[in-house]
Amino acid sequence: MIRPIKKITLRKTKKKSPKGVIHIQASFNNTIVTITDLRGQVISWSSSGACGFKGAKKSTAYAAQIATENAIKQWTDQNTKQAEVMMSGPGPGRETALRAIRNSRVILSFIRDVTPIPHNGCRPPKKRRV
């Protein structure tokens, strides 16, 4: 008699890392907050657009604050409270996002600005003649 073959599946278990990295990307149009573990695996994320803000309201400081609070709320459910912060971009939500992190009682080990700066980069467009 033939026995049915049992399906062997691997269950993925999320490892709770003691520390996380909060990446804040603040552009002039939107603010994206991504929280990863130390290896770079995404744990939670949020953005101004994902929080329900549309159009010009996405680029406000208040939208960045709400996006940061949402991402941290998902992350702290896993009982992780220590983080590093990497900020990039010149947007208006940059300082507000950092203020929201400080208000959430997350222990910060360091804050680093990782905005890319060109070493004389691309040639600018020609001057406009009107």
UniProtKB/Swiss-Prot annotation:
Gene Ontology CC: one annotated term: ribosome
Gene giving rise to this polypeptide: rps11
One Gene Ontology term from the biological process aspect of the record: translation
Compartments where found: Plastid, Chloroplast
Disulfide bonds: none
Keyword rRNA-binding in annotation: yes
A single GO molecular function term of this UniProt record: structural constituent of ribosome
Transmembrane segments: none
Record keywords: Chloroplast, Plastid, Ribonucleoprotein, Ribosomal protein, RNA-binding, rRNA-binding
Pfam families to which the protein is assigned, alphabetical: Ribosomal_S11 (PF00411)
Similarity comment: family membership: Belongs to the universal ribosomal protein uS11 family.
Keyword Transport: no
Protein name, UniProt field: Small ribosomal subunit protein uS11c
Record note on quaternary structure: Part of the 30S ribosomal subunit.
Source organism (scientific name): Chara vulgaris
Principal localisation: plastid
